[in-house]
Amino acid sequence: MQEATIAAIATAPGAGGIAVVRLSGAESYQVAARVFCPANAAKKVEQAKGYTAMYGTFREGDEAFDEGVALFFRAPHSYTGEDVVELSCHGGNAVARRLVEACLAAGAQPAAPGEYTRRAFLNGKLGLTQAEAVMDLISADGRQGAALANAALGGALAKKIDAQKQELTAIQAHLAAWVDFPEEDVPELDDDHLHRVLSGVKEELDSLIRNYQADTILREGVDCAIVGRPNAGKSTLLNLLAGFDRAIVTPVAGTTRDVVEQAVQLGDVRLNLFDTAGLRETEDAIEAEGIRRSWKKLEEAGLILAVFDGSEPPTREDLALAQRCAGRPAIALINKEDKPTRFDPELIAPFFAMVLPVCCQEEGSRRVISAAVARLLGTSQIDAHAASLSGQRQLSAALRARDAAAGALDAAAGGFGLDAVSVCVDDALAALCDLTGENASEAVIEQVFKRFCVGK
């Protein structure tokens, strides 16, 4: 059944230079002809060739309400694989909404969230991993995160997985022939070759899985708790990383009583910073609640920046904080290095991945912290142009495929017979097909595209 022609605003809402309304479907040119009048009367919208543009006015009935440009794309050479017309009007909600309403009145249907990319997937213009990369690219905040998404959109992951599928398919074909046609005298698989192929597939999947956490941080950022006792310099650190005075800084201990939030871009990593209340014993009920929230943020954070006052000896609260950071992705910052140091970092070093002397009032410390964060989170080692996994769906499929490949290796090494190896190889192939979307159910497709906004 032919899909309805759909319309939606494809650009972000709000004031801007232009807004784009996208039409896709078999009736796109006819709908466009009812709302767009070319300035050159000799030109006909329905006859426009692909990859061409026209200037004219947008109309609703007999009334012209704006002027702009129409871009034309003929199927299958378009984003969705269908006839597509993109109408560029002046930016602003009122004009763009009116243009959409005119398109709907002319016969189009409202687009659902992600429907354009969904159609691109269903029409074979994008694989499922590439469709997911579209959303990652839209959401990317940092350069490396955008590069990872762009690599996936270009097919880096799909190509890597297809290569592993080809290796396993060749093995499976040989196994099937050997098991099913014994009368044909099919030679048994060479053990060394079997081990080499299965090990190679497992190692490729292991590499993708190992890098998943760092790749995800580059794409999505990480929650970062700034913790320490009062007046250690937590709010000063927040302001340094934010690049402006986000938090109030005073000499009075306990100034910060609630969690102060601020998203910052530190190098290629987006940090969702949480400046917490100073950790100390208190009789003040309000401050005590702030301290409880501080400990909670520490437990939940994907990164901890623990700030210590380097101008004073370590206190009981400092040592308690250090112990709570043990085994977590935590960096100790010995603040106030511009003053005489009385803090012995060796007392807390066993509990942290790194201990850094800093001055939270100096820009140089921001660069030091940025480099340390990238090292700790593993983002500095990531090749942003290589294949990478994105999201729990892809990770789960990769884990299943890796475990099945490992099972095939164990079956071969344990002498369980080629039938057992064949079952494991089948499982690995099925998981890889799930990853690339070849076996994707309607429920999986719905889950992928519900993350998209209307217009994409």
Listing of model-derived features with the role each one plays in the protein:
Residues 242, 277-278, 302, 309, ...:
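Short glycine-/small-residue-rich Rossmann-like dinucleotide-binding loops
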Residues 273, 307, 333:
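Generic enzyme active-site microenvironment
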Residues 55-65, 70-74, 254-282, 300:
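Switch I (G2) and immediately adjacent beta-strands of P-loop GTPase domains
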Residues 2-9, 13, 143-265, 282-284, ...:
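C-terminal-of-GTPase-core extension/linker across diverse P-loop GTPases
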